[in-house]
């Protein structure tokens, strides 16, 4: 199980990403707009740099909802591979069966 501090840090990052998503999207649109003047685009770039570093969605890490494991996490379930296996064998994930051919 991952340390609680790491899990909480990821939750904090998720909140920051959600909080600044609109502002970030607006600034990115201004930066990418060729119709705007160079000065406007430059000022938008400076504003984007002033946003918190953790407001960037690329800094988020997918973690298992149960254990906090950072690797081997399936996006569809939000769980690590070993927890998916345990829960699937118990039959607690509807529609998921063990493959056999």
Swiss-Prot record:
Entry keyword set: Ribonucleoprotein, Ribosomal protein, RNA-binding, rRNA-binding
GO biological process: translation
A Gene Ontology cellular-component term: cytoplasm
SUPFAM superfamilies: Glucocorticoid receptor-like (DNA-binding domain) (SSF57716)
Disulfide pattern: none
A Pfam family this chain is assigned to: Ribosomal_S14
Molecular function (Gene Ontology), one example: rRNA binding
Family named by the database record: Belongs to the universal ribosomal protein uS14 family.
Assembly and oligomerization: Part of the 30S ribosomal subunit. Contacts proteins S3 and S10.
PANTHER family: 30S RIBOSOMAL PROTEIN S14 (PTHR19836), SMALL RIBOSOMAL SUBUNIT PROTEIN US14M (PTHR19836:SF19)
Functional summary from the UniProt entry: Binds 16S rRNA, required for the assembly of 30S particles and may also be responsible for determining the conformation of the 16S rRNA at the A site.
Protein's name in the database: Small ribosomal subunit protein uS14
Protein's organism: Cupriavidus metallidurans (strain ATCC 43123 / DSM 2839 / NBRC 102507 / CH34)
